[in-house]
Regions:
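Pre-Walker A (Motif I) flank of P-loop NTPase domains
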Residues: 37, 45-50, 241-245
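P-loop NTPase motor domains
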Residues: 68-72, 76-78, 85-309, 335, ...
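Conserved lysine of the Walker
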Residues: 60
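N-terminal pre-Walker A segment at the start of P-loop NTPase domains
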Residues: 13-38
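The conserved Walker
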Residues: 52, 56, 299, 328
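Conserved P-loop NTPase motor module
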Residues: 1-16, 28, 130-136, 376-478, ...
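Conserved ATP-driven motor cores of ASCE-family P-loop NTPases powering translocation/secretion/packaging/pilus
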Residues: 2-3, 66-68, 91-107, 309-395
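Pre-Walker A adenine-sensing motif
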Residues: 32-43, 233-235
Length: 503
């Protein structure tokens, strides 16, 4: 182990920055904080993505809060997922505490309590700016991925989208999509078959069942209008600070499909909308995905490939993705390899499997002459973390056990009245919280089917009337025998014979 002076020099050189940066805290050696050995993250590398990991109660959420605050202060907007409901306090300044002052004195940083510009958003019926997307915007590829469809079923989904494009039928919500799917094998079977080929009823039945499963997780709340414009995520307030957009997800932890659907839709829309930026001095937007395992658990291979592709490509748009989870093994290796910043809080070894995971995690970090990484991972205290980042030239910085700085904002939830204040001040609620139900595929096809049914009924009535008329004509037209038997001549003749007999 090296001495303090060597360690300080090692950190000072490894974290020397020419451009703008965020200070995370100060390096630690043998459990002691080395004052002014500041651990800095260059802003220009923030679009290289990152990981914040650690056991429950080790300080992951506070680290997320620190990063979000400092990015906002630098004029960079942030989007973060609040699955536990404890991030809304960012809107209010920290009340302060002697322990915070003591921590910052050790780090060598002044502590300045402050609140930040916040926009509260929601995927469900919770209060906040409603986030929605139309099925058309989601597109056939993403919809097939999220439904985990076979190649044949993917083809049917593509045909449904093509039919709607060709016939100018807006696909706004899941009801629209289901209606077209039912129409394809019902009333519109001939129309579809002549234009796109035969569509299997069993395949459409499977797709319908998977859509119903998605609806049961609340996706019907997400699909629809008014569709959210991602440009509204990159707003700056009047003081030049980036808005921190907090999506309240406390009620969807048990609905991972909805979470995955939203995340993929959002990332795809951002990638399609934001201009190419390349390597610039600062990112355009940073996203923090809390409880990241919800995206990766039970995800199909196709879905994981989609996520990996987006992670690779989206950084060129100036977007940084930060996954927050308990264990780095929650994130697939191919995604983990794309992450430039790693903030690892303490891991707990209760089982042989845990110890194996810690050894694997230690191998993800640069070798350090000052630390036994596996040992440090289990001995870190709350609010301490191992940090490995990229310097301004994209090279790994020295591994540093770090005493993390405290958040400047409140480390607790907002009260109901404080949330109401934030919502009342929002400019986006007025824009997005009005539900629109314009004419779409469901209504147009329903009308088309109704019209066809009325015409069929009319034709049926005409045929029935025609039959009745024919029947009446037949009944009034005399049978020749009857005609003879009932004729006056025949009757008179018979009566004449009878008279003769009587005589």
């Amino acid at each position: 182990m090296g001495n303090k002076e060597n360690f300080f020099e090692h950190i000072a050189q490894g974290y020397a920055m020419k451009g703008d940066y965020i200070t995370m805290g100060a390096g630690m050696l043998d459990g002691e904080t080395i004052t002014d050995a500041h651990i800095k993250i260059p802003l220009k590398m923030m679009n290289r993505h990152g990981l914040i990991a650690g056991a429950t109660g080790t300080g992951k959420t506070k680290t997320l809060q620190v990063l979000a605050e400092n990015l906002s202060d630098k004029g960079i907007p942030v989007l973060l997922m609040d699955l536990k409901g404890d991030l809304s306090g960012i809107a209010q300044p920290s009340p302060g505490h002697p322990k915070i002052d003591e921590r910052h004195e050790k780090i060598g940083l002044p502590f300045e309590p402050k609140g930040f510009p916040v926009e509260i958003m929601s995927l469900s019926e919770q209060d906040g700016v409603r986030l929605r997307a139309t099925v058309s915007e989601f597109g056939p590829v993403l919809l097939s991925r999220i439904l985990d469809l076979t190649v044949t079923q993917e083809g049917i989904v593509a045909v449904v989208f093509k039919y709607c494009d060709d016939n100018k039928l807006p696909l706004l919500d899941l009801n629209d999509f289901k209606k077209v799917l039912q129409y394809a094998t019902g009333e519109g079977k001939k129309e579809f078959q002549s234009a796109y080929g035969r569509i299997s009823t069993s395949s459409t039945g499977t797709i319908l069942r998977k859509i119903i499963e998605l609806e049961q997780q609340g996706a019907d709340l997400f699909f629809g209008e008014k569709s959210f414009e991602v440009d509204d995520l990159v707003r700056i307030d009047e003081n030049g600070r980036g808005f921190i957009n907090i999506i309240r997800l406390t009620d969807i932890q048990d609905r991972p499909k909805l979470f995955s659907t939203f995340m993929l839709s959002l990332l795809a829309e951002i990638y399609a909308t934001f201009p190419e930026q390349g390597d610039s001095d600062r990112p355009e937007l940073i996203l923090f995905i809390d409880e990241a395992h919800l995206i990766f658990d039970n995800a199909s291979k196709a879905l994981l490939d989609q996520i990996e592709s987006i992670v690779k490509l989206i950084r060129s748009k100036g977007i940084g993705l930060y996954f927050v989870t308990q264990n780095p093994t929650d994130v697939p290796d191919d995604v983990l390899a794309q992450l430039g910043l790693k903030v690892q809080h303490a891991l707990r070894a209760f089982t042989a499997k845990d110890r194996k995971a810690i050894k694997l995690t230690a191998q993800n970090y640069p070798i350090s002459e000052f630390y036994d990484t596996a040992e440090v991972l289990t001995s870190l205290g709350t609010g301490e973390a191992l940090i490995s980042a990229l310097d301004e030239k994209g090279r790994p910085t020295p591994l540093a056990a770090t005493m993390m700085r405290a958040p400047m904002s409140r480390m607790d939830v907002l009260s109901d009245s404080e949330i109401k204040e934030v919502l009342d001040a929002s400019k986006l609620i007025k824009k997005y919280n009005e539900e629109i139900d314009r004419e779409s595929a469901y209504e147009i096809l329903s009308e088309k089917i109704e019209k066809a049914e009325k015409e069929a009924e009319k034709e049926k009535e005409i045929k029935q009337t025609s039959r009745r008329t024919t029947s009446t004509r037949r009944s009034t037209r005399m049978n020749p025998v009857v005609k003879v038997l009932t004729s006056a001549t025949f009757i008179r003749g018979v009566l004449g014979v009878l008279k003769k007999v009587i005589r």
